Amino acid sequence: IRPAPPGARMTQDQLKQAIAFFHHWQASDPHHEYLALCFDVCHQAVMFEDCRQSLESLRQAGVPIGKIQLSNAMICRLPSDDPSRCVQVLDVLGSFAEATYLHQVQARDVRGRIQCWADLPAALAACASQPGRYPELRVHFHIPLFSEHLILPELGGSQMALAQTFDFLAAHEDVRPVLEVETYSWSVLPAPVRPSDEQAQHRGIRDELRWVEEQLRQRRLLQPQAREVHADAL
């Protein structure tokens, strides 16, 4: 089951609801062992949630985690002391607004309050009309997992959320969900970072998988491959 509250993101309130649902299901259905939760890293990052803490809460509550969708949200940091640069950053961020998918946005304002918008154009308009109010935007746009920056230094990814997720898995040998790379937005990336053809997209997907492998390897989460023994060596 993939939690889908408004905007398809799991806040602490929805996390409690998910835990309550699984407790009810486990108590009432003898087939509950076939049901598990699907956890989307991008969604948690957009909500300013700590993925490791969320996963720890689920594990401690006995909620089975069947799948983790590895996805990289976009983070935009707006320079409040440079209005002209802020305009430039918003202009480039606007190139990620497209009609195929909704790109929900969460922002933390200068007072620490959270503001949300259903799609990127509304967030851009709010930031343009209230310069300096929102120093950081988090955008539900699945960028390649290995991307630390896109086009401008102010436009980055939420790799810290992915690191929190991998660190959780490294700490708990009893949690081994399916890991699914969920970057579905290659074809709608802005032209400067969009794959030029199918082969380029295949290379991007390959590089994502290699990046994930390296993160797992660093945390000793990959089983060593058995050494091949060729018949002519026997």
Specify the residue positions occupied by each region the protein language model found.
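Residue-level marker of intrinsically disordered, low-complexity segments enriched
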Residues: 87-90, 150, 227
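Eukaryotic N-terminal low-complexity, Ser/Thr- and Lys/Arg-rich leader segments
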Residues: 227-234
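Generic marker of "main functional regions" within proteins
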Residues: 49, 75-80, 106, 111, ...
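Flexible, acidic glycine-rich loops studded with aromatic residues
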Residues: 64, 115-224
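Acidic/histidine-rich catalytic cores of soluble enzymes
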Residues: 1-128, 134, 143
